[in-house]
Every structure is written in structure tokens, then in C-alpha cells.
């Protein structure tokens, strides 16, 4: 089993309701730095057909781990309007 002990929930808003969420999810998974893990991805309907992706990213409670770093990587991906850390908690 891994030694991850915290999880950060990062909410990603696509730039448009027409964005292919499957493709966007794969692009976002590809930019998560190797030292992090991914527990799951959920889809959250927002309004007017817009759906947010919620990434449950695993990390360690030690220097060198920052969920803001992951959110910044997500913001660089095409078709991402915003990426914000919603919560961080121990697991």
C-alpha cells in the first residue's frame, strides 16, 4: 500500500459546456506530477450543461507536496477555465 496520507480535491472547470470531458480528463491525468497519486475523478453538474471535474489527488504531509502545484499544472491545459483546490484532508 502507498504511504500517501493526505488527499486534495481539485475542482476543474472546463472553458465551455461543449468540451469533451473524457479527453479533458485524460489530458489532466497526464500532467499530474509522478510523486502524486490519483484516487478518483468525479463529475459535478454545475448549470446550463456545464460539468466540473473533481480530482481526488493523493499526496504526503511533508515538504515538497503542494496541491496548488497540481492546480497550476491543470490551469495550463487547453480548455481549462479554472482549477482550484477545494479541500485538503488527512486519510
From Swiss-Prot:
Transmembrane region(s): none
GO MF entry, a single one: translation elongation factor activity
Highest taxon of the lineage: Archaea
SUPFAM superfamilies documented for this protein: eEF-1beta-like
Any Pfam family: EF1_GNE
InterPro entries: eEF-1beta-like_sf, EF1B_bsu/dsu_GNE, Transl_elong_EF1B/ribsomal_bS6, Transl_elong_EF1B_B_arc
Keyword Protein biosynthesis: yes
Keyword presence, Protein biosynthesis: yes
Coiled-coil ranges per UniProt: none
Keyword terms of this UniProt record: Elongation factor, Protein biosynthesis
Gene3D superfamilies: 3.30.70.60
NCBIfam families according to UniProt: aEF-1_beta (TIGR00489), PRK00435.1 (NF001670)
Function: Promotes the exchange of GDP for GTP in EF-1-alpha/GDP, thus allowing the regeneration of EF-1-alpha/GTP that could then be used to form the ternary complex EF-1-alpha/GTP/AAtRNA.
Family as reported in the entry's similarity comment: Belongs to the EF-1-beta/EF-1-delta family.
Protein name according to UniProt: Elongation factor 1-beta
Organism lineage string: Archaea, Methanobacteriati, Methanobacteriota, Thermococci, Thermococcales
Amino acid at each position: 500500500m502507498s504511504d500517501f496520507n493526505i488527499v486534495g480535491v481539485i475542482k476543474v472547470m472546463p472553458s465551455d459546456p461543449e468540451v469533451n470531458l473524457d479527453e479533458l480528463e485524460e489530458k489532466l491525468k497526464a500532467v499530474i506530477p509522478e510523486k502524486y497519486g490519483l484516487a478518483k475523478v468525479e463529475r459535478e453538474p454545475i448549470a446550463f450543461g456545464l460539468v466540473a471535474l473533481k480530482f481526488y489527488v493523493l499526496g504526503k504531509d511533508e515538504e515538497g507536496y503542494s496541491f496548488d502545484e497540481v492546480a497550476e499544472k491543470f490551469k495550463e491545459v487547453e480548455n481549462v477555465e479554472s482549477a482550484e483546490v477545494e479541500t485538503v484532508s488527512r486519510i
